[in-house]
UniProtKB/Swiss-Prot annotation:
Phosphorylation at Thr-18 or Tyr-19 inactivates the enzyme, while phosphorylation at Thr-169 activates it. The modification Phosphotyrosine is found at Y19. Its EC number is 2.7.11.22. Present with 6670 molecules/cell in log phase SD medium. The keyword rRNA-binding does not apply. The keyword Transport does not apply. It catalyses: L-seryl-[protein] + ATP = O-phospho-L-seryl-[protein] + ADP + H(+); L-threonyl-[protein] + ATP = O-phospho-L-threonyl-[protein] + ADP + H(+). CDD domains: STKc_CDK1_CdkB_like. Residues 8-295 form the Protein kinase domain. It comes from Saccharomyces cerevisiae (strain ATCC 204508 / S288c) (Baker's yeast). This is Cyclin-dependent kinase 1. The modification Phosphothreonine is found at T169. SUPFAM superfamilies: Protein kinase-like (PK-like). One of its GO terms (molecular function) is RNA polymerase II complex binding.
């Protein structure tokens, strides 16, 4: 089921992800033409217990995901009881770095935003159709290839390994793209957690800065409330069942999204509004988002 570490020649360390170090490597297996791959070393919380078999099963499912908008997982290397390496298609640019490379006073451009959004919605829709959630979507794990197309990375890893509070580097894992049902302590969540994140990324591509940039869970919740208004049972009936919801939360009024994201046309605002619906039941699906009028030629 898993390959051998000797099949890969490490070239250099290229980064540190949520779960461990990422290396640029050569795939030495016959017939692969020495292609360049990303070798992700997974550091597991409980070093003493080894790699859980559930994680291996989950990750094996990810090898079946084959879509233009998803970073391919080529191989799984379980070198010993404690170490796991995932071998992915290599892409050296992510959306965060891509945006940082464009001067802050310049827009990304409406056409680029629309193209990336379409690729993001299609990639998520594909994964959701295979019953796989991402749960940790953010610009850092949206990768851009040399043709300028966007692909989703780190899909399904959250279910296999959990979403840690801190990355193994002790850097706090960002809350900026996290759905309100998760922030409010909900344990039963579904595909809506990813479509919320798409909405946050959409607004960020337009505004060139995060729409909700909290530095703690409560700050994140209040940042959302300040823009979208404090939710109540009328607009989100199940909110009262979320463990961390308090009727005593400060009451903010909703802002007009067209003033929050002024560069977006009315169709774009409508899509953003549907992605950032409070009640996950009312949140647009990725499949429906991909056929929203925003994407039609205007």
């Amino acid at each position: 089921m898993s390959g051998e570490l000797a099949n890969y020649k490490r070239l250099e360390k290229v980064g540190e992800g949520t779960y461990g170090v990422v290396y640029k490597a050569l795939d030495l297996r016959p017939g692969q033409g020495q292609r360049v791959v990303a070798l992700k070393k997974i550091r597991l919380e409980s070093e003493d217990e080894g790699v859980p078999s559930t994680a291996i099963r989950e990750i094996s499912l990810l090898k079946e995901l084959k879509d233009d908008n998803i970073v391919r997982l080529y191989d799984i290397v379980h070198s010993d009881a404690h170490k796991l390496y995932l071998v992915f298609e290599f892409l050296d640019l992510d959306l965060k770095r891509y945006m940082e490379g464009i001067p802050k006073d310049q827009p990304l451009g409406a056409d680029i935003v629309k193209k990336f959004m379409m690729q993001l919605c299609k990639g998520i829709a594909y994964c959701h159709s295979h019953r796989i959630l991402h749960r940790d979507l953010k610009p850092q794990n949206l990768l851009i290839n040399k043709d300028g197309n966007l692909k989703l990375g780190d899909f399904g890893l959250a279910r296999a390994f959990g979403v840690p509070l801190r990355a193994y580097t002790h850097e706090i894992v960002t809350l900026w793209y996290r759905a309100p049902e998760v922030l409010l302590g909900g344990k039963q969540y579904s595909t809506g957690v990813d479509t919320w994140s798409i909405g946050c990324i959409f607004a960020e591509m337009c505004n060139r800065k995060p729409i909700f940039s909290g530095d703690s869970e409560i700050d994140q919740i209040f940042k959302i409330f300040r823009v979208l208004g404090t939710p109540n049972e009328a607009i989100w009936p199940d909110i009262v069942y979320l463990p961390d919801f308090k009727p005593s939360f400060p009451q903010w009024r909703r802002k007009d999204l067209s003033q929050v994201v002024p560069s977006l046309d009315p169709r774009g605002i409508d899509l953003l509004d549907k992605l950032l619906a409070y009640d996950p039941i009312n949140r647009i699906s990725a499949r429906r988002a991909a056929i929203h009028p925003y994407f039609q030629e205007s």
